[in-house]
Amino acid sequence: AGQDNFMRF
């Protein structure tokens, strides 16, 4: 889940 957060870039 946290790793998907970086995709918010």
UniProtKB/Swiss-Prot annotation:
Keywords: Amidation, Neuropeptide, Secreted
Keyword Secreted assigned: yes
Modified residues (Phenylalanine amide): 9
Tissues expressing this chain: Detected in the thoracic perisympathetic organs in larvae, and the dorsal ganglionic sheath in adults (at protein level).
GO cellular component, one term: extracellular region
Domain of life the protein comes from: Eukaryota
Compartment(s) where it occurs, according to its Swiss-Prot or TrEMBL record: Secreted
Keyword Secreted set for record: yes
Record-level GO BP terms: neuropeptide signaling pathway
Main localisation: secreted
UniProt record similarity statement: Belongs to the FARP (FMRFamide related peptide) family.
Name used for this protein in its record: FMRFamide-14
Organism, as annotated: Lucilia cuprina
Source organism phylogeny: Eukaryota, Metazoa, Ecdysozoa, Arthropoda, Hexapoda
